[in-house]
Swiss-Prot record:
Protein name: Ribosome-binding factor A
InterPro entries cross-referenced by the UniProt entry: KH_dom-like_a/b, RbfA, RbfA_dom_sf, Ribosome-bd_factorA_CS
Classification of source organism: Bacteria, Bacillati, Mycoplasmatota, Mollicutes, Acholeplasmatales
Protein's organism: Phytoplasma mali (strain AT)
HAMAP family: RbfA
Assembly mode: Monomer. Binds 30S ribosomal subunits, but not 50S ribosomal subunits or 70S ribosomes.
Subcellular location: Cytoplasm
Amino acid sequence: MGLTNEKLASLIKKELALIINVSIRNNKIGFINVTEVKLTNDLSFANVYYVILNNQPEFLSLAAEIIEKNKSTIRMLLAKKIRNIRKIPELVFIYDTSLEYGNHIDNILKGINK
């Protein structure tokens, strides 16, 4: 019996975090955190949401460039780590803006309370 969609997404998230921060690590941008992985029902695509600790615009674009440049290597390394599925999904990396949005809302609420 195969893994459920949620368990597989969780496993992919864990493995991608290790692969990105160990195998393709770039000291200029620092730590990249994989926040969420969403799989399509047919498991052909995985939307991988990530944030970086240094969220200045030049570092965001550098992180996106490094991830895109190494996407095939990341997928290959993921395939070596996860062997109990037939096909590794195509990875689509998306910068996660939800943390920034949450901070923005928090600042608005703090301004209202003053």
